[in-house]
Amino acid sequence: IKSSAASDVYKRQTLDRRYFPNRGVSLEADYSLYTDNFVKYNGRSPFSAIGLKFMTVCPISSRLSLLPAFYGRVLIGGNTAFPFLNAIGGETFGRYLSQQLPFAGINHVEILDNSVVVARLQLRQRIAGNNYITLTGNYGIHNNDFFHLLEGKSLWGGSLGYAYNSIAGPLSATFGMSNRNSHLQFYMNLGFMF
């Protein structure tokens, strides 16, 4: 599949650190138009995607923080190519696919319907120096029709993890569960995420 995309991204970030921030807000909104000849896609109308990511850090004390987040992606048009479908899984945005949304409890990539929205809440405790424990819960909903999103299929999941903020980046181990798998999931990260 040969395609080209025209996109526009708005980013605003006031987080004090990239990893384990203590305060701040992150907001990103993006729009992409996908074509194969700058006019059409596969001889028909092009399709597009709208994305939104919001996260804030609410410090409860000098060691304990609450991190609510809300994010989603909507595909517009009926001719969406498989490589651009919505995907969830893992701990970070865009880990394996540029449009991948994180979801605690799902460590692999899953393809979802044309509209997906996720609400996530993390409770992070710094236990000593650069050591952190994070409890994450998230709920998502997806449907092919954005206007009937609330009638879509539900996703839920959660994880509990330990991380050390090293000079080589975060070293972490996480255990998670979701309604999309029947076994406890394990994820390990060794260093910076590129």
Task: Name the predicted role of every residue range.
Residues I1-A6:
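Single conserved hydrophobic/aromatic residue that forms the stacking wall/gate
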Residues D8-K11, L15-I127:
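C-terminal outer-membrane beta-barrel translocator/porin domains of Gram-negative envelope proteins
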Residues G24, S61-S65, A128-Y132, Y164-P170, ...:
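Strand-connecting loop/turn motifs
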Residues E28-S32, A69-R73, T134-N138, A163, ...:
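Transmembrane beta-strands of outer-membrane beta-barrel proteins
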Residues F38, N144-D145, P170-S172:
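Short small-residue beta-strand/loop micro-motif enriched in glycine and branched aliphatics
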Residues L101-F103, N114-V118, A128-T134, L155-S159, ...:
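Active-site lining segments that contact anionic ligands and/or coordinate catalytic metals
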Residues Q122-W156:
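C-terminal hydrophobic structural anchor segments
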Residues Y162-G169, A173, S182-F194:
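Outer-membrane beta-barrel "beta-signal"
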